[in-house]
Every structure is written in structure tokens, then in C-alpha cells.
């Protein structure tokens, strides 16, 4: 049974059982700083299980793409070497949110495996939590599983929790028995680490809430979370013991083999590298599709590590030219129908992989040469020095796990203590991963409130002032009954017109006025999605829970923010029209002062393109069409062509913002009523923020007018300095720059002539030290280039001498040292130049016979030169 058919059969089976198909979420978890990547099928439903989000269905089924590379779950180093380790995989899962429980889910799982897929019951082995008599009874007495094929296991294997506190419960796992010809015992036995029994499905029963003391309280509405790896199930149904022998990987392995000219199965090393490429092209392609690009930190660094590991294995297969991007097309052919977003992003993925591989290959050979030299004489079991590991990472871009991969092949170990020490000495640690649970702890009070309070009613689309009731107050991270004058705190209302920061739009500011108090709102946030929190300060009086307040948004700021937000939609559409449909929004910020828009594009936007973008956006503004908003089913909105932002999570119904025929996007932000309200659009800057990601900053309305007037003032001032009319400024500036270049050339010639004259006269001033001519001199008004010219002249006159020249120009010191080749065993030019530079706060280096340095503090130069003279005498004496 092919993987595509397995995936479809799973989804269809659970639809028949009343489940709603939920499309796969991106690999980037939304609003969850605790996770680097989506690593399980339940991640998109985490807020539902926590009670922070409601869905219009209580039963769900999905085929969720997942990543395990970086962070707590990291399978990268084992990928290619084992039968079942992957960076990217698909998790089939069915979920119940307070609907069915153990009896139903166990029955669903058993019938799907044995009836729909036809697996022999005698090939399945069951585990339950050692204290879960209910699940054991269902398996044995209702399903009819032989007690001899059921194991009771401890908390480590069969009790699941979301964290130290919160929802948790026992789980039951289903294993497949591959047969006695494969070593290994059943789960729970001393031989369980063998490969005979392979877990294929985990059924998690969320029935408890664990508090900080460890006490378990039964949940009023228990839920179910299940997960089954498609790759493992495909191996079972296709009669193979290795996931890489399934149809999920075989076409990719065949494509990699064709590109490299190798044959899969010819030898172990070749097979490992081909499996690495097949796995890594899946991970890299979906990461880029989901908005991640190679970078030096966070998720982008994980992607970079995976790409570079793939390139290294490609090189092992003899691929000496850029190749990795050629595997995208075979992947799209296999998975594009199940994940159409991959098909849409194919060209962008190919470009990103090609750029990154080209960049890495520039240093790959040099890095490998350094490593080969370092390990050439190491015996098996020896350690690669930490200094080498660090230098490979810092200078040649070798992720540490890539070096570890090579160490594994050579039967070497890694000196990680030495690596850490080298990194500390350099004070330039490699990028750290995202994460940490501290952010979650700081929001615990929000979490508790979200569990108790209803959804905040937001009225801000239709009004900027409304009445609301104070339902919670927070000060210093704790719930309080009141806030007094001078207190900084947080106010939560049952209804509010204040927009909470989301979708790139800044939160509203304004004030809350009760009969007895005035609270100035400086920001509005939505930390738990549906809970609006107003941050600010009590200006007067005392604000208490239960008080009624008039919530008034700062309308001037709101209008400016709305103008910037609507302009962002116009900018997005203009970019796609002018640069191409590959442009995708990668981030944005809109507030009253400006807009910032990040988007995918492989190269800087030219000045001509920026002018055209600005012209197109302003033309749309002048057309003054209305900005229409509608609530539609998500499928209908997408059918109409509304752009969805990748990575955003949408419900069954979405808000569509349409601006004539120019732009239509899914958006929950506030907008102008008509495009003419934007006024004018002015681009301030265009820059790069990461590989393949560009940023445009712009302003609208009154802020744009101020920017235009500032530019005009600068133009007038510059014209005044050059004593010309503004219209003639460019011509006069070109003339002035040309004259400046001529003067600089003349000055360089004067300096060279002076250096020649200085060199000619200085040779006679050399001091004899033990038969060696030594010349150490300070020269005023000479820069580094002039010093080099002087040194060249002097070395021709004193070929067996020691020379140090110091040039002083505009409070900067340039230093150069030359040592005759026959003297470098006694005097090293690099050490010599540093004896002068270091007392001046500088540093230099170079070859034994020639070195340079730069420094400041010319007042201390004479003393430093005298010290250098004594140092040379000590070396030659």
C-alpha cells in the first residue's frame, strides 16, 4: 500500500467516525516560544487542550508535518545511519476535545489497523500504563487482545505530560512485530531495545491536571491525542524493515543516485549518504516553504546545519558542483499533491538551496583540508582538538554536528570541553537556539485568567469608545483586587474597543475612565489569543475589579495605524506585481509612526523598482476605492483568491479585507474606510535582514509629508553649501567629487614622493646591533600606504636589517615592521609590531618577515618605540 493511499485511508476512516479534517499546520509553531519546530501532531491543538481556544468541532484528524532537529528533540546526528531516524516526518493523528475517550479511541485504532489496513492481530503488541486497569481491561476483554501480547510499563514509557504542570495522563502504545528473524524482545522486556517490535501508534489519554505540587486532579472533560508516524506505518504495509525502503524515500534516493552516478546498495557509506540526502531534502524544502531561510541563529541556523550536512554528504558521493536544489523537483512530484504549498514554493525553495550551497562550497574545501590535516595522525578513539572544532565553525562555517559526523566516520571523539573553552576565549559563541520555558512562566497568570474568563468581546472594528467592566487586575505579575494612583499594571475588561497587538499591528493606546479613576493605556496585548490586556498606569484615583469604565482609544493614533496597515496590503500587492509572485510576506510591523514590511526576494530591490512600487501604491491610493471587510468561510475566501499569510492559524471563518481589484487578504487588523484616507505613501528605506529576506520601511499621511519636507530641507541645505540651485545640485556634486578624486591622487603622489625621500635618507640612520642594522623611526603625516612604500625602499637598502616605521596621521598610528629573512628565527615581525601596537591599544599581525598594525594614542608612541628598540636588542644581543 503506497504512502499516499495510507494517508488518504487514515483521513477518510476518521471522517467516517465523525472527525473534521484539519490541514497540516506549518513547521513553525504559532505563538509558542517554547518550541523550535512543530514536533508532534498535537502541537497545533495545544491551546485547545489547554482550554485557551475553542474550535467548532470536537473531533479532529490530521496528517501533520513535523521536524525533530535542534532543541530537545534532535535526531540529526543519527539520520542516514539508522532505519527510522528522520529530521522531517508526517504524524497521522486523531483527536478528541472532551468528546470520546479510551473505549472509543482504542476501538478506532484497532479496527483501522486490522480491518481497514488488514494487519494480522497476532502481529500487534500493546502496552498500557502500569496503573491503567481501565485501558488494559478494554484491550483484553473488549477488543480481545491476548494477555500474552500486552505489557504494563512504567511512567517513563507510558505516562504523557505537556509540561511540569497542566494536562497529562496515561498512554497506550501499539507495536508491530516484524518477526523472530529480527533480534529484540517485546516492549517492557530486557531485550526491548532490539528492532523486532516497532512502535507505530501512541494513544494518549489526557485525563488529569497536574499542579505544582504534583497532585493529579481528574479533568471534567478528558481528551485524546494520538500519533502514528506515516513512515513507520508505510514500512509495515510495504513489507520492509527500513523506512528508507518505502515509496516515501525510494524516489528521492533514486534521484540522488542518478545525480551522483552512484548505486544504492553498493556499499554502506554510499547508502548512508544517499539516505541523508533523501531525508534532508524533505526537511529543508518544507522549512523554506514554511518561511525559514538559512541564518546564523534560531530556526534558520538549524536549516543551515541540515543543508551543510547534505552538501558534505553530496561531496562524499563525488558531487563537486552545486546539486542539492536538483532534488526539489522529485520531492514535489512525490508530495506536492498532499501539500500544494510545497508546489507553489518550489522555485523559491530551489533558489534558497542553490544560494546556500554556493556560499558554503566557497569554504568547504579549505575547512575539510584543515580537518584532514588535524586528524591525519589521530588513532581510532582519539579526540579531535576543541580548537580545531571551534575554528571550523567560526571561520569555515562548519556546524559542530557536521564535524561530529566526520568524527563518527573516522571512529574519533570530539573534545567538546576544548571547544567550549575556545569559544569562551574568543567571546563569540555560536548562535543559540530559540526557546526556554521562562517566557511561559511569566505568562502563567495570563494562562490562569484565560482558563477562567470568557473571550474578551472586541468592539473596535466599529467604534473607538465603549463601556466595559473590569474583570481582572494585575500588578507585578500577580492578580490584585485594585490599582491605585501611580501603579503600573494590567487591566482586563469583559469588552473593549482596544485592538490587541497581533498580525504585525501594534496594540492601541488611550485611556480607561471610571467614576473614581483614570488609567492611561500605553499598549494592548493578546497574550492568550482571545484575552485582551491593557497595559499602563493609574493616573488618578483607585481602579477596582467590578468597576465600569469608558474605554477610549486614541483615535489619532488608531487612524495613523490603520493607514499604515492598509498601505502594507497595497505594498504587498505592488511587490508581487512588480517583482514577481514568489514574493511572500515574512513579517510586518504597523504602528502610528511607520510601517515595516519583510518579504522574500533573492536580491536587493533596485532604485528604479522602488520608484515604480511607490508610484503604483500612490496610484491605488488616489483611486480612493473603499476598503471592504467581510467574514467568510476560509475555503470560500481562498477560492476567491484572498492571500493567506503563511504560518498564521485561521479558524473556519476568516475576515477578508478587499481593496478593489488591487488587493485581497485574510486580515484581522484595522483599516481605512477608503484608500484615499491613506493620503500619500513614501518609502524610507530598503535593506536586507537575512539571506533571501528584504525589508521596506515606509510612512503614510502626515508622517509621509514630514519625511518629504525633511528631504526637501536637506536638499536645500546641500544646494546652499555648494552655492547652486537645487535643480543643479547633482551636476555640481559630480564636479566636486571629480575634483576631490583628482586632489586625492595628487596627495597620494606627494606622499609617495615623500616616502621615497624619507626612505633614501633614513637608511644611513640605522643603528648597528650585534652586526645587524636596526632602524626604528616615527614619521609624521604618513598613512599605511606611504609607510609600505618607504619600507620597500628601506628593505632594498637594508636587506638583512630590522625595520620598524610608525606613521602618525589625524590621531591614528600606522605601524609596519620588516625583518630580513635570515633573521626571522631570532626576530618575528608580527611579535615586533605588536610590542609597539599593544601599549597603544592596538593589535596587528603578519608573516615572520613582514607585519602591520594599527593603533591610537600617538602621545604614547615614542615610549612604545623605545621599548621596541630594547626588545630588539634583547633578541639580537
From Swiss-Prot:
One of its GO terms (cellular component) is cytosol. InterPro entries: aa-tRNA-synth_II/BPL/LPL, Ala-tRNA-lgiase_IIc, Ala-tRNA-ligase_IIc_anticod-bd, Ala-tRNA-synth_IIc_core, Ala-tRNA-synth_IIc_N, Ala-tRNA_ligase, Ala_tRNA_ligase_euk/bac, DHHA1_dom. Zn(2+) binds at residues 565, 569, 667, 671. Its cofactor is Zn(2+). Its EC number is 6.1.1.7. It comes from the Bacteria. The keyword Metal-binding applies. It catalyses: tRNA(Ala) + L-alanine + ATP = L-alanyl-tRNA(Ala) + AMP + diphosphate. The keyword ATP-binding applies. Its main location: cytoplasm. Keywords: Aminoacyl-tRNA synthetase, ATP-binding, Cytoplasm, Ligase, Metal-binding, Nucleotide-binding, Protein biosynthesis, RNA-binding, tRNA-binding, Zinc. It is found in: Cytoplasm. Coiled coil: none annotated. GO terms for molecular function: alanine-tRNA ligase activity; aminoacyl-tRNA deacylase activity; ATP binding; tRNA binding; zinc ion binding. Gene3D superfamilies: 2.40.30.130, 3.10.310.40, 3.30.54.20, 6.10.250.550, Bira Bifunctional Protein, Domain 2 (3.30.930.10), Threonyl-trna Synthetase, Chain A, domain 2 (3.30.980.10). GO terms for biological process: alanyl-tRNA aminoacylation; negative regulation of DNA-templated transcription. Binds 1 zinc ion per subunit. Catalyzes the attachment of alanine to tRNA(Ala) in a two-step reaction: alanine is first activated by ATP to form Ala-AMP and then transferred to the acceptor end of tRNA(Ala). Also edits incorrectly charged Ser-tRNA(Ala) and Gly-tRNA(Ala) via its editing domain. Consists of three domains; the N-terminal catalytic domain, the editing domain and the C-terminal C-Ala domain. The editing domain removes incorrectly charged amino acids, while the C-Ala domain, along with tRNA(Ala), serves as a bridge to cooperatively bring together the editing and aminoacylation centers thus stimulating deacylation of misacylated tRNAs. Belongs to the class-II aminoacyl-tRNA synthetase family. This is Alanine--tRNA ligase.
Amino acid at each position: 500500500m503506497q504512502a499516499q493511499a495510507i494517508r488518504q485511508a487514515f483521513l477518510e476512516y476518521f471522517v467516517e467516525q465523525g472527525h473534521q479534517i484539519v490541514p497540516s499546520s506549518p513547521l513553525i509553531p504559532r505563538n509558542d516560544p517554547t518550541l523550535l519546530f512543530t514536533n508532534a501532531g498535537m502541537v497545533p491543538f495545544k491551546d485547545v487542550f489547554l482550554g485557551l481556544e475553542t474550535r467548532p468541532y470536537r473531533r479532529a484528524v490530521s496528517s501533520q508535518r513535523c521536524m525533530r532537529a535542534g532543541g530537545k528533540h534532535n535526531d540529526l546526528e543519527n539520520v542516514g545511519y539508522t532505519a527510522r531516524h528522520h529530521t522531517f516526518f508526517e504524524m497521522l493523528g486523531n483527536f478528541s476535545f472532551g468528546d470520546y475517550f479510551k473505549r472509543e479511541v482504542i476501538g478506532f485504532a484497532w479496527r483501522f489497523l486490522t480491518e481497514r489496513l488488514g494487519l494480522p492481530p497476532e502481529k500487534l503488541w500493546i502496552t498500557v500504563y502500569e496503573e491503567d486497569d481501565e485501558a488494559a481491561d478494554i484491550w483484553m476483554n473488549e477488543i480481545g487482545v491476548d494477555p500474552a501480547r500486552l505489557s504494563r510499563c512504567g511512567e517513563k514509557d507510558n505516562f504523557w505530560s505537556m509540561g511540569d504542570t497542566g494536562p497529562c495522563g496515561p498512554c497506550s502504545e501499539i507495536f508491530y512485530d516484524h518477526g523472530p528473524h529480527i533480534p529484540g524482545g517485546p516492549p517492557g522486556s530486557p531485550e526491548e531495545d532490539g528492532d523486532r517490535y516497532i512502535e507505530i501508534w501512541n494513544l494518549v489519554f489526557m485525563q488529569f491536571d497536574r499542579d505544582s505540587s504534583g497532585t493529579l486532579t481528574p479533568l471534567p472533560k478528558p481528551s485524546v491525542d494520538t500519533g502514528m508516524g506515516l513512515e513507520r506505518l508505510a514500512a509495515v504495509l510495504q513489507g520492509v524493515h527500513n523506512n528508507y525502503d518505502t515509496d516515501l524515500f525510494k524516489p528521492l534516493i533514486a534521484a540522488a543516485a542518478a545525480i551522483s552516478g552512484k548505486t544504492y546498495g553498493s556499499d554502506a557509506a554510499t547508502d548512508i549518504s544517499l539516505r541523508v540526502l533523501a531525508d534532508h531534502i524533505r526537511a529543508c524544502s518544507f522549512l523554506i516553504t514554511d518561511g525559514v531561510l538559512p541564518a546564523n541563529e534560531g530556526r534558520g541556523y538549524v536549516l543551515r546545519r541540515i543543508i551543510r550536512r547534505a552538501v558534505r554528504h553530496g561531496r562524499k558521493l563525488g558531487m563537486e558542483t552545486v546539486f542539492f536544489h536538483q532534488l526539489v523537483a522529485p520531492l514535489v512530484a512525490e508530495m506536492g499533491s498532499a501539500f500544494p504549498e510545497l508546489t507553489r514554493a518550489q522555485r523559491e525553495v530551489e533558489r534558497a538551496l542553490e544560494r546556500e550551497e554556493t556560499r558554503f562550497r566557497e569554504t568547504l574545501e579549505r575547512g575539510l583540508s584543515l580537518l584532514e590535516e588535524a586528524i591525519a595522525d589521530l588513532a581510532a578513539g582519539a579526540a579531535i582538538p576543541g580548537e580545531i572544532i571551534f575554528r571550523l565553525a567560526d571561520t569555515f562555517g562548519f556546524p559542530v554536528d557536521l564535524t561530529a559526523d566526520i568524527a563518527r566516520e573516522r571512529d574519533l571523539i570530539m573534545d567538546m570541553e576544548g571547544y567550549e573553552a575556545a569559544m569562551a576565549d574568543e567571546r563569540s559563541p555560536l548562535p543559540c537556539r530559540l526557546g526556554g520555558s521562562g517566557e511561559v512562566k511569566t505568562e502563567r497568570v495570563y494562562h490562569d485568567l484565560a482558563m477562567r474568563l470568557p473571550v474578551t468581546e472586541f468592539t473596535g472594528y466599529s467604534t473607538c469608545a465603549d463601556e466595559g467592566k473590569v474583570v481582572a487586575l494585575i500588578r507585578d505579575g500577580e492578580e490584585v483586587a485594585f490599582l491605585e494612583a501611580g501603579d503600573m499594571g494590567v487591566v482586563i475588561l469583559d469588552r473593549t474597543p482596544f485592538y490587541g497587538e497581533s498580525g504585525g499591528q501594534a496594540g492601541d493606546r488611550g485611556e480607561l475612565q471610571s467614576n473614581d479613576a483614570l488609567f492611561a493605556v500605553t499598549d494592548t496585548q493578546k497574550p492568550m489569543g482571545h484575552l485582551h490586556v491593557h497595559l499602563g498606569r493609574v493616573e488618578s484615583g483607585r481602579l477596582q475589579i467590578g468597576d465600569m469604565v469608558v474605554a477610549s482609544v486614541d483615535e489619532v493614533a488608531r487612524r495613523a495605524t490603520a493607514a499604515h496597515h492598509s498601505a502594507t496590503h497595497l505594498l504587498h500587492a505592488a511587490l508581487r506585481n512588480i517583482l514577481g509572485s514568489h514574493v511572500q510576506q515574512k513579517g510586518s510591523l504597523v504602528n502610528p509612526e511607520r510601517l515595516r514590511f519583510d518579504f522574500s526576494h533573492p536580491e536587493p530591490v533596485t532604485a528604479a523598482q522602488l520608484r515604480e512600487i511607490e508610484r503604483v501604491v500612490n496610484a491605488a491610493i488616489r483611486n480612493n476605492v473603499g476598503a471592504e471587510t467581510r467574514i467568510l468561510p476560509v475555503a470560500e475566501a481562498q477560492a476567491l483568491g484572498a492571500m493567506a499569510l503563511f504560518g498564521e492559524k485561521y479558524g473556519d471563518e476568516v475576515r477578508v479585507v478587499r481593496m478593489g481589484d488591487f488587493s485581497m487578504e485574510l486580515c484581522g487588523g484595522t483599516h481605512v474606510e477608503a484608500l484615499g484616507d491613506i493620503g500619500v505613501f513614501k518609502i524610507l528605506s530598503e535593506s536586507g535582514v537575512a539571506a533571501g529576506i528584504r525589508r521596506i520601511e515606509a510612512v503614510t499621511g502626515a508622517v509621509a509629508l514630514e519625511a518629504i519636507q525633511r528631504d526637501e530641507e536637506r536638499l536645500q541645505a546641500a544646494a546652499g553649501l555648494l552655492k547652486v540651485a537645487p535643480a543643479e545640485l547633482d551636476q555640481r556634486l559630480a564636479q566636486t567629487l571629480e575634483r576631490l578624486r583628482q586632489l586625492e591622487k595628487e596627495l597620494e603622489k606627494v606622499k609617495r614622493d615623500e616616502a621615497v625621500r624619507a626612505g633614501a635618507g633614513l637608511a644611513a640612520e640605522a643603528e648597528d646591533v650585534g652586526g645587524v642594522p636596526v632602524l626604528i623611526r616615527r614619521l609624521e603625516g604618513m598613512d599605511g600606504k606611504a609607510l609600505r612604500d618607504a619600507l620597500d625602499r628601506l628593505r632594498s637598502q637594508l636587506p638583512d636589517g630590522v625595520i620598524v616605521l610608525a606613521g602618525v596621521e589625524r590621531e591614528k598610528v600606522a605601524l609596519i615592521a620588516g625583518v630580513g629573512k635570515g633573521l626571522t628565527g631570532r626576530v618575528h615581525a608580527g611579535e615586533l609590531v605588536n610590542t609597539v601596537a599593544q601599549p597603544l591599544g592596538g593589535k596587528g599581525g603578519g608573516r615572520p618577515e613582514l607585519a602591520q598594525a594599527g593603533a591610537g594614542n600617538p602621545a604614547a608612541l615614542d615610549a612604545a618605540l623605545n621599548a621596541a628598540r630594547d626588545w630588539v636588542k634583547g633578541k639580537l644581543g
